[in-house]
């Protein structure tokens, strides 16, 4: 399932960050957007380059190419040899990495503020001058396949998640795993990665987010110095793909060695489209919080603590999606002696209770207070401040919607929460994936291994 809830990301840091921090937005002549959030608590800076290119933009037969290119971006340019990017950042006392999702690919560094020019120099260089050789690709694609084995093939719940995505989405690109299918990775070529890089890696398809002990105007000058000379590209036309309405429940069973069964179920729901007028996504966000937003939420109370049907149970919803499609998901691990059927029935019972009886004002206030209470927490993560800005901008909205997010949540009524449950959490709109545990071979060894750039 995609990120479980944008609410979680907001809880990492206080909402006052956006009310009080100085945020400035710039745009270079080549189309690169720069957003700077000044944070002068410590002499540190976080720099993130976000490309609007993720698995959403891939085509069948080349799944995983966005993530493969992320790996290849560390393989050097004419000026910087393979692996030297990471060594230069480390030598400056910094940290760096990258990640790929359905909607974007992001590269980031965290450094002492005087080293921001190094970050900009390296990122601008590889934005335009990546040397993607057949030799380096042949080595790195094997690393990616190992990562796929480690992330998915070795993990029963990951297998369920992948099967669920393929079942819940039949036409939409969100059906494809970000890491790619193994067959596609085995048949991928360096030319496929080069094509991806040439199509999407351009200043007019990127957002540069800087958070830290800096002055916005100085960062703008530095960005123009390093990124301003890069040429924009004519980007491929993105063809919208809409998932047809589901007209009947779907089920998929995954058999894999595991200790316990597992249940993952979800309903098609809308993602945020118009931040000014949409109310349903905010009501769905609150509904997820009512079910699983805190220890007193319904699923934990009813399924885990009272009936002891499940070891854990949760609900989640991501209102931010560039593909403008989302899933209201629920998952649970049955307690020993209980079945996935027991847990599924209990989850649906909780949903039906909300559809029939609604939610209490107390529950609603508890969920809303969870977000508002984040105001009292000390801001300690520049990285997540950048994450929020970069995610929203890359998805296609303005970071400014964060300022109104708490007000949107406050405005949600019990009637609206009940209304979205009645409208979307329907039997014919349901997809269920379950793990059927098979005996574990005590001599079996993991197939894959993790990767760090």
Labelled PLM ranges:
Residues 65-73, 287:
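Active-site His/Glu-centered metal-binding helix of metallohydrolases
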Residues 75-79, 127-135, 151, 356-360:
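Short, polar/flexible loop-turn hinges at active-site or ligand-entry regions and domain interfaces
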